[in-house]
UniProtKB/Swiss-Prot annotation:
The keyword Transferase applies. It catalyses: (2S)-2-hydroxy-3-oxobutyl phosphate + 5-amino-6-(D-ribitylamino)uracil = 6,7-dimethyl-8-(1-D-ribityl)lumazine + phosphate + 2 H2O + H(+). It holds the Pfam family DMRL_synthase. GO terms for molecular function: 6,7-dimethyl-8-ribityllumazine synthase activity. One of its GO terms (biological process) is riboflavin biosynthetic process. GO terms for cellular component: cytosol; riboflavin synthase complex. It comes from Trichormus variabilis (strain ATCC 29413 / PCC 7937) (Anabaena variabilis). 5-amino-6-(D-ribitylamino)uracil binds at residues 23, 61-63, 85-87, 118. The gene is ribH. This is 6,7-dimethyl-8-ribityllumazine synthase.
Amino acid sequence: MAVFEGTFTQTEPLRLAIVIGRFNDLVTTKLLAGCQDCLKRHGVDPDPHGNQVDYVWVPGSFEVPLVARQLALTHRYDAIICLGAVIRGQTPHFDYVSAEVSKGIAAASFQTGVPVIFGILTVDTMQQALERAGIKANHGWDYAMNALEMASLMRQLRSNVTDSYTQTQSLPAAFPNASIGKLTAESEEV
């Protein structure tokens, strides 16, 4: 048997996309800066004119899952990082948006087999959001680390499945409904 664990050092030639909600951009731009700092320190070129990271700005967090799924369907990216901030107001709007964004990001990942990282802050106050975007810590850094680890792990798993298929001409028993290279609807239980 084998042990698989993602690494943070094998970043060439990783391709990442970052989807950022523009609403509450005082927070989301700080999350993005933390994310870019982490990527740069781990050998990923965050330059938007480079060839490793694409950036997509959307109106708000609610639009993030749709765009993340569309990007994941291209299979051009090793991971997609979703950044946004939903801050509770005095209406139930917060609950609806938070729930649908969470479900949508998870579905994008499950349906495509591409790691789609949940980097949406769901907080009660702007102060809490700012604390998580740089005053006390920057969760943008954490989201980038998650993306690096998951991209590495998924590459290892795909390589192992492909190697097993090449060696035995059949998929391992652990993946009875999977197909090489992409997941099918039958291979995932949500």
